[in-house]
């Protein structure tokens, strides 16, 4: 196999990993905002369908939303954003969080093997995001208290930089960054710290 064919195959894997990482991240984060306990058994022999060695049971509604709303995933778009918003029974809306997956073309590392190292690093980044999703103010204050009579947390996805105003004293945290010969993927979290609805 020629070097160009190997490079082309590695790039195809890079693109595929970017898409599957992003869709798994959305599934995991949306499920973390449902307020339901998620129990998964450990397995010595992982199922090959468990991308990045993380068992995530897909929600059909989320998969359908991604199919209808998203045409490109990183690296084919520079930024993919997942927003969470609190909707009250009175019709008020409080933007809570924006999760961003970015493709950073300038962050290359020719020594990284896409199939093994990048795949493993994306798995670690996915697990880090899952843990971080349970440490935010939105999770602590609202996720387990949702009810149709008070408020519910909704989400939206789009292929550009975050658009929400998260109020004064919003915070930004870089969850992680992984590099490859074709560029890097990063995950950033922006979140609200003042839980007040503007009137």
Can you describe what each PLM-predicted range is?
Residues 1-199:
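Long protein-protein interaction modules used by eukaryotic assembly/scaffold proteins
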């Amino acid at each position: 196999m020629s070097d160009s064919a190997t490079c082309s195959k590695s790039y195809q894997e890079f693109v595929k990993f970017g898409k599957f990482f992003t869709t798994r991240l959305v599934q995991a984060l949306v499920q973390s905002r449902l307020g339901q306990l998620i129990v998964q058994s450990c397995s010595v022999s992982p199922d090959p369908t468990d991308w990045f060695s993380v068992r995530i049971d897909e929600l059909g509604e989320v998969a359908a939303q991604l199919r209808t709303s998203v045409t490109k995933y990183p690296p084919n778009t520079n930024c993919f954003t997942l927003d969470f918003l609190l909707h009250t029974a009175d019709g008020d809306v409080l933007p809570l969080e924006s999760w961003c997956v970015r493709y950073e073309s300038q962050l290359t590392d020719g020594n990284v093997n896409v199939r093994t190292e990048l795949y493993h690093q994306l798995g670690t980044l996915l697990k880090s995001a899952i843990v971080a999703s349970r440490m935010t103010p939105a999770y602590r204050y609202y996720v387990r208290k949702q009810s149709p009579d008070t408020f519910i947390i909704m989400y939206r996805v789009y292929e550009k930089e975050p658009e929400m105003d998260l109020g004064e004293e919003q915070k930004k945290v870089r969850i992680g960054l992984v590099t490859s010969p074709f560029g890097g993927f990063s995950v950033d979290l922006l979140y609200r710290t003042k839980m007040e609805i503007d009137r």
